[in-house]
Each structure stands twice: as structure tokens, then as C-alpha cells.
Amino acid sequence: MDRSQEHYANGDQNLEANLIDHEVVTESSSSAVPQTENYKRWLRVSIYVIFVLFCQPLATILGRLYYENGGNSTYVVTLLQLIGFPVLVLFRFFSRIRQPKSTDTNFSQSPSFTTLASVYLCTGLLVSAYAYLSAVGLLYLPVSTFSLILASQLAFTAFFSYFLNSQKFTPLIVSSLLLLTVSSALLVVNTDSENSTNVSRVQYVIGFICTIGASAGIGLLLSLIQMLFRKVFTKHTSSAVTDLAIYQSLVASCVVLIGLFASGEWETLPSEMRNYKLGKVSYVLTLASAAISWQVYTLGLVGLIFESSSVFSNSITAVGLPIVPVAAVIVFHDRMDASKIFSIILAICGFLSFVYQHYLDEKKLNTSHTSAVGDLHLPVEEGHTNIQSV
């Protein structure tokens, strides 16, 4: 009996040791997986940030370069922001191959064809509207002024996110809205310093109003996309990001093409290319480069919304704010007076307020997530204690 009891005791100890080892291995592996996924997520975010920071300023400069050297078609500049979507088909194919198996346990169904068609149609129409308004604004405004006014999209994003995504108006966000508003107001009252031989005061005001409208359209679109990812695209995949970017650009391109032919501007394009100051080859390269830059920027923007939020994606857009005015001074010899410098400083301060608020939100979210994970381990420890007491 003593040997039998000793045998059973040794068996219980071995069983207990195996259970403890299994628990340690399971816990370490489960903690390693989220860490790996976190690294991959930040790698994707970094790529999207690079797309946004470099492609939007480049596309804006190229659009102005088209106007400065003999281009006159606002529909062409509008189309440049949209027509490059076939470039994303390759990215869509790549993301489908590399897409990891979903770990979502909600088993949510994919949106119906009718729902997807409605989403792509509505967002495409909105994209075509703000793209045309921004093309008109870029025609009548110096590129540095245009980029500074367009920075007010950050304020519009917060405004629309308040209604669509329950965005809270903290003191930092309110101060950011005020700074961005004052920054734009300085530019509208500074029309005399922007005097141009080719642009009248009325055209300047039209450009300002159109740019503000484009900024509001961008803010509405970004907030709407964030809501769609929360309520419609419940399966969070990179394919959903690229599909949205491709199909909304397809719809918007069709709308703008209809406008191009209906307005008769297409008839002037051959002579415009012949008379382009930099030559025919430069004409084609300028348009092609701008189209690709705009589409890569769109991919980065939608990707940041998918990985974080519309406010964060717009904040990253605002990081490139100083790039365009400085480049405009070098390339197009735009005036950089005291009021414009002060406007840049105010816009950057408004951007920093947004970024700091986002940092506080992320920190709070990570703290709550860590606390939740700690609570989940408590039952395991109690079960482990019960095993030891058997």
C-alpha cells in the first residue's frame, strides 16, 4: 500500500508539473502573439504615414505646376486626384495573398452587394465634389495659401466626428479648432498681400470659398469612412481598405469624366499639351506623377483610418503642412510674409493639440486594456491554486 500511495503521489506531482508547464507555455505564447501583431500593426501604420506625408505635398505641387505652365482645365486637375486608382489593384492583389487568417470570433457576415454599392456610390460622389472644389481653389490661390486653408480639414473632421463617431470635444480639441480657424481667417483678410496679376480679388475669394468647401468635404468623408469601418465593414481587413479606395475613386472618376466631356474642356486638351511650356513629355509626366501620388496618398489616408481613426489620419496629414508652403516658395516663388508665417505657426500649434489629445486617448486605452488582461489572468491563478491543493 505504501508503494501504491507513493506511486499515486508521484503521478499527481508529475500531472501538476505538466499542468504548470502547459500553463506557462500557453501564457507566454499568447503574450507573444499580440506583441507580434502589434509590431506588424505599427509597421503598417508607418508605411501609411510615409504615403500621406510625402505624396500629398508632391501631388499638390505637381497640380500647381500644371497650372503655372499653361494648364487650364479644372476637370483635369480633379481627375488627377482620382484616376490613378488602377495602381491600387496590384496592392489589392498583394494584400489578398498576404492577408492572415481572421481571428475574429464574431462571425459577422460581409455586407450585401446593395450595401456596398450604396457605400461606394455615396463616398465616390463626395470625393468627386471635394476634389473639384480643391482644383478650383488651387487654380485661384497661391499653393502655400491653398495648403494652409486646407489644413482646416482637421477642424471639420473633429466637427463631423462629433456627430458620426461620438468624438468628445476636450479642451485640447477645442483649442485646436480655434487655432485652425484663426489661421485660415488670417489668410482671407490678407488678400492684398497675395496680389497677383492673373487673379482678381473676386477670383481669390472664390478660390478661398472653394478650398474651405473642399476642406469640409474631406473632413466629412474621413469621419464617414471611420463610421463605415465601425458599422458596415465589421471584418477589419486590408482588402476592405483597398476596395473602398478603388471603388470610390472609380465612381468619382466616372462623374468627373462626365463633367469633362459635358463642359467641352476635353476639346482644348490637345492644344493645351502642344502649348505646354515645359513640353509634351513633361506634360504627360506631370499628369501621370500627380495621379499616382494622389492615389497612394488616398491609400495611406484610408489605411490610417482603418488602423486608428479619422482624426489621427488627418493629424498625420497636417504634419506635412510646412512642406508645401516651403516648397512653394522655392519652386513658385510664393510670398512668405509675416501673416502667412504666423498662420503656419498657428496651424502647427493646432495640429500639436490634436496629436497630444490622441496620445492621451491611446494611453488611456492601453491602460484599460492592460487592466482587462490582468483581470483575465485571475481565474487562471485561482485554478492553479486549486490544482496544487488537490
Swiss-Prot record:
Q: Which Gene Ontology CC terms are recorded?
A: membrane
Annotated membrane topology is:
Multi-pass membrane protein
Which Pfam families does this chain map to? Answer: PUNUT
Q: Which UniProt keywords apply?
A: Membrane, Transmembrane, Transmembrane helix, Transport
Q: Where are the transmembrane segments?
A: 42-62, 74-94, 110-130, 131-151, 169-189, 205-225, 244-264, 286-306, 312-332, 341-361
Q: Output the superkingdom of the source species.
A: Eukaryota
Signal sequence bounds? none
In the UniProt record, does the keyword 4Fe-4S occur? no
GO biological process terms, alphabetically, are: purine nucleobase transport
Record GO terms (molecular function): purine nucleobase transmembrane transporter activity; purine nucleoside transmembrane transporter activity
Where does the record say this protein resides? Membrane
InterPro entries cross-referenced by the UniProt entry: PUP_plant
What family does the entry list?
Answer: Belongs to the purine permeases (TC 2.A.7.14) family.
Q: Which PANTHER family match?
A: OS09G0467300 PROTEIN-RELATED (PTHR31376), PURINE PERMEASE 22-RELATED (PTHR31376:SF57)
Name-wise, this protein is Probable purine permease 7
Taxonomic lineage? Eukaryota, Viridiplantae, Streptophyta, Embryophyta, Tracheophyta
Question: What's the name of its gene?
Answer: PUP7
